[in-house]
């Protein structure tokens, strides 16, 4: 599910490497670069890719720190990267100079990160196990007006409080919550499933059922994020915000 993934992984890379986001470019998924990626599904995009990007960036940062420590004769743990500058007890170097120096000294400047969700197991027969790493919570109150004679309805106001853990990007997450609500409203009010006498689904595309549009958004629409650190080890203690708002 779309969650502003490119922006979020760019934020993760920027934060881990200590460089401005303007220096980060995320490329589209391409099997020529990463042949075995997981599907963009189950609201797992930010969790999986964010942790993988963080792992890859930590690998790169360790290589660069090791190189700088040897070059400047200082302890590895005293080297920091912040705002595009590498600093140590006796030096400061812009990021571009660090990269050039590493390249000239034949330090590998590429890395792969991998992450899989831990602690997941489920026995279908026994109905036991842990199918999910964590749960996302939310509460909403919606005011609607309904014509009791025709059934015509309109959403007047909606107030939502949604649990995103420690949000990676509040603007993106609020937009996702808003979109999930409108999508869910359409699912419950206009997207009817109709089969013919032979069991063939007739309402199989937007051409055969009505989906909500921008005008179906409530005029008063208040969304707040419940800033509650995820107790699980997710990327910066955030939570998925793909399908949870829809439900």
Give the predicted meaning of each segment.
Residues 11-247:
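C-terminal catalytic domains of large/alpha subunits in multi-subunit enzymes
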Residues 6-7:
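Conserved strand-to-helix beginnings and helix N-cap segments that scaffold or border functional pockets
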Residues 1-3, 134:
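Conserved beta-alpha junction segments in alpha/beta enzyme cores
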């Amino acid at each position: 599910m779309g969650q502003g993934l490119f922006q979020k992984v760019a934020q993760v890379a920027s934060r881990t490497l200590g460089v401005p986001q303007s220096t980060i470019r995320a490329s589209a998924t391409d099997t020529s670069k990463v042949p075995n990626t997981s599907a963009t599904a189950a609201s797992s995009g930010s969790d999986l890719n964010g942790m993988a990007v963080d792992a890859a960036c930590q690998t790169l940062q360790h290589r660069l720190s090791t190189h700088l420590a040897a070059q400047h004769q200082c302890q590895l743990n005293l080297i920091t990267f912040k705002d595009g500058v590498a600093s140590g007890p006796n030096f400061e170097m812009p990021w571009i100079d660090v990269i050039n120096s590493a390249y000239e000294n034949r330090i590998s400047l590429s890395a792969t990160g991998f992450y899989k969700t831990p602690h997941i197991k489920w026995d279908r027969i026994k109905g036991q196990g842990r199918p999910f790493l964590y749960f996302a919570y939310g509460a909403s109150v919606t005011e609607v007006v309904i014509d009791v004679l025709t059934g015509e309805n309109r959403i007047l106001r909606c107030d939502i409080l949604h649990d995103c853990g420690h949000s990676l990007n509040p603007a993106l997450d609020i937009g996702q919550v808003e979109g999930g609500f409108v999508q869910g409203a359409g699912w419950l009010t206009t997207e009817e499933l109709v089969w013919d006498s032979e069991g063939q689904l007739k309402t199989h595309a937007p051409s055969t059922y009505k989906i909500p549009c921008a005008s179906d958004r409530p005029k008063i629409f208040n969304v707040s994020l419940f800033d509650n650190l995820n107790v699980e080890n997710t990327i910066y203690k955030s939570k998925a915000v793909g399908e949870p708002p829809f439900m």
